[in-house]
Amino acid sequence: LHRELLAQAREGSHRFLRLIDEAVSGQGWEVSYHRDSAEERLKSAKRNGKALFHMYDPYHDNALTYRLVYYMPFWQIEKSAKRWEWDVAQAQFDPSEIDKAEARQFHRFWSQRLFGEAVADVTKEGFVYVPLQGRLLDHRSFQAMSPAEMVLATVEQEPDLPIVLTFHPKETYTADEMTTLDEEICAAYPRVVIGEQDWLTYLAECDYLVTQNSSAALAAMFFRKPSVLFGQIDFHHICGNVYDVGAEEAYRQVKAGGQKFKAYLKWFLQDNTINAGKDDVHQQILD
């Protein structure tokens, strides 16, 4: 664990780590905490026991990793640090198996809890929202193409609507990246603009969203907005997935509509995570 998380774990103030401790201690295991250094992760393979990493790849047979599933109190314990390799990513979503009343209740409660008044006035103002992430010129292994190429593909697949890009607040963009955006994309295609409003405003007002694998696409489901994905991720099931079906089909699926947002959010977050707020959380952890 990193320094702050390690201190919280040892003092018992981190709820999920405390719940893990309680669950495994109840089975007779002794729990110890260590820094998340490369040295300690290597040592974990030689210890007589199991290891649980925070977000790092569990590289040996006796290791797992845990990670927040976007929103508290939803967590996952998995055999891979890559979200698109998680069990839920490989599972099949069948909306007919989800209770409609429970799905509506889940959507109503969590929409308000997570986004408050932002979800009160959802419209379609006739534009595509593209929340950029990092490394705009790189085509990484989990991506169908680079983020810059993704924007150009959107220009091709969406010939009419304005396309609003936003920058990730935690990313730093290079001069080459900015030149590509300004000169090769925005100047060449005036429909493509850099947005300056709050991202929740764009979620509430866009027709649909395009991204590599930003969690904004999951958030968009609370606003009942569909997304085109160019990267692999765990919440891909009701999105237009370019990585799997190609750009033309992915955009066609999104524009066709009919996505079961309420059923999906209940299935993805409630039925396929460890919910730290549930009474049976210790058994969920052990399972």
Task: Place the predicted regions along the sequence by residue.
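Short loop/turn segments at strand-loop or loop-helix junctions that form parts
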Residues: 1-4, 55-57, 71, 125-137, ...
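Secretory-pathway glycan-assembly enzymes, especially type II membrane glycosyltransferases
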Residues: 1-110
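Well-ordered, non-membrane alpha-helical segments in soluble/globular domains
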Residues: 10-20, 143-157, 177-182
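Structural alpha-helical scaffold elements that stabilize or flank donor/cofactor-binding regions
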Residues: 44-45, 121, 201-205
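Short, well-ordered alpha-helix to beta-strand connector turns
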Residues: 47-50, 64, 125, 161, ...
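Leloir-type glycosyltransferase catalytic cores
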Residues: 80-125, 239-287
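Catalytic donor nucleotide-activated moiety binding site of glycosyltransferases and closely related
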Residues: 152-194
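A donor-sugar binding/catalytic signature common to diverse glycosyltransferases
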Residues: 196-241
